């Protein structure tokens, strides 16, 4: 029964003349290790009146809170009230059917963030005040034009490549959320930034790839030394061969000179 009443409220709100709010069909996109939060809520946003375990809405209580107002002031209509449940099974979920309307959920950020003071803009409501025995998680139904901001959870660091925000837009008659440009990585993974010195690791604690690089470098040095030694030995051998050739040539010249001198001596004797 409560689900049908909520659906009737949604349809009535959308069909009332002058109300141009269009509900977003999907949830804001999810980013690993990040949460999103709205700094302010556009007029037409609805918040389910959910109670924590062991409590339920009072029978005459509102099913949801609605952000309404005019050009100068916006506020939340209705009030959520919870009372103790008589039995465990009397608590009812105040959410529309999945095929009719999906739930909009937000999670508290790890630290406050105020990128834009949207609450001061016309047509926006601030965060609704808490009510007694409220559920731990709030379920919103966002409208077109709503903006949510993303932040990395504790233990992760943001690597911005663009705006860390998402906006619900209407495109070709269908609603869609823009994709936030945010990447969250572990602090250990992003500790090394340009300009930071990387700690020196001992050879024993180095990975196998680094050890193989060291072995390869050592082998290369050994091969270089061997090549240099071989070149030196080759050069020495060539030098020895050249010296031997010069000595052989000198001896040959001396022998030829001796033979020539002997022939001249013989000719001179015959002439006498």
UniProtKB/Swiss-Prot annotation:
Residues 260-272 are cytoplasmic. GO terms for molecular function: interleukin-2 binding; interleukin-2 receptor activity. Residues 87-123, 190-212 are annotated as: Disordered. GO terms for cellular component: external side of plasma membrane; interleukin-2 receptor complex; plasma membrane. Residues 1-21 form the signal peptide. Pfam families: Sushi. Glycans are attached at residues 70, 89, 218, 224, 229, 237. GO terms for biological process: activated T cell proliferation; activation-induced cell death of T cells; apoptotic process; cell surface receptor signaling pathway; immune response; inflammatory response; inflammatory response to antigenic stimulus; interleukin-2-mediated signaling pathway. Residues 22-84, 123-186 form the Sushi domain. Non-covalent dimer of an alpha and a beta subunit. IL2R exists in 3 different forms: a high affinity dimer, an intermediate affinity monomer (beta subunit), and a low affinity monomer (alpha subunit). The high and intermediate affinity forms also associate with a gamma subunit. This is Interleukin-2 receptor subunit alpha.
